[in-house]
Amino acid sequence: MTPIFFNQQYPTLVDICARWQLVYDANATFELRFESDTLSLHKRDEPKLDGIVVDFVTGAVAHRRKFGGGRGQSIAKAVGLKQGVMPSVVDGTAGLGRDAFVLASLGCTVTMVERHPVVAALLEDGLRRAYQDAEIGDWMRERMRLFHGSSLEALSKLAQEVDVVYLDPMYPHRDKSALVKKEMRVFQSLVGADLDADGLLAPALALATKRVVVKRPDYAEDLDGVKPNTVIETKKNRFDVYVKAAMK
């Protein structure tokens, strides 16, 4: 059971916390709120910080879907997306679902795996609103779903054939931008660093039929010390690609 603070007078919050086995704690560091049909996470000792929400419909994520470069984006190249090839993807470290959403918006079917119940609750709420949206709801229902569980367990238990496993383990950020600082400070204090991240590569390679893609900061070492087959570099990050078979 994960401790959380929330207004116990709100039936919606009571239901959400019961569903995700979140237990009320008056002294908890984090608070969940449900306002304007949106679930948000707040760090109680930093009240000036905005709440963290999962929003696939508006804001930066929607802007990237419309103007972000389509299949020319590095992440699309990394997973092998090309004309006539729409890989199925397991995102083993879903976080706020942004990379998963980019891949789904480009045509991939994506299963997001998230082990932390608070983050999973935020993802589910974001999916609920996206599924209801007139513009993106139809394809969101077809292409994006959530699997709550330990990444390691989930990757080994997912029975269906998966083309690509995508991993973006939590890594200490040097970036000083306000957004990264805010979200990473809140996120890392909520979920902690991915101390078992190296243990993800082997089950990911066992599950993926075509390739495993690992997103890393440009200064990070190779995951589990294993050299990738190819590397796609961006301004601040890189995608390490471990190829098992050709994309067809």
From Swiss-Prot:
This is Ribosomal RNA small subunit methyltransferase J. The lineage of its organism: Bacteria, Pseudomonadati, Pseudomonadota, Gammaproteobacteria, Alteromonadales. It catalyses: guanosine(1516) in 16S rRNA + S-adenosyl-L-methionine = N(2)-methylguanosine(1516) in 16S rRNA + S-adenosyl-L-homocysteine + H(+). The keyword Transferase applies. S-adenosyl-L-methionine binds at R98, D99, E114, R115, S150, S151, D168. One of its GO terms (molecular function) is rRNA (guanine-N2-)-methyltransferase activity. CDD domains: AdoMet_MTases. Specifically methylates the guanosine in position 1516 of 16S rRNA. One of its GO terms (cellular component) is cytoplasm. Its main location: cytoplasm. Belongs to the methyltransferase superfamily. RsmJ family. Keywords: Cytoplasm, Methyltransferase, rRNA processing, S-adenosyl-L-methionine, Transferase. It is found in: Cytoplasm. It comes from the Bacteria. Coiled coil: none annotated. Its EC number is 2.1.1.242. It comes from Shewanella baltica (strain OS195).
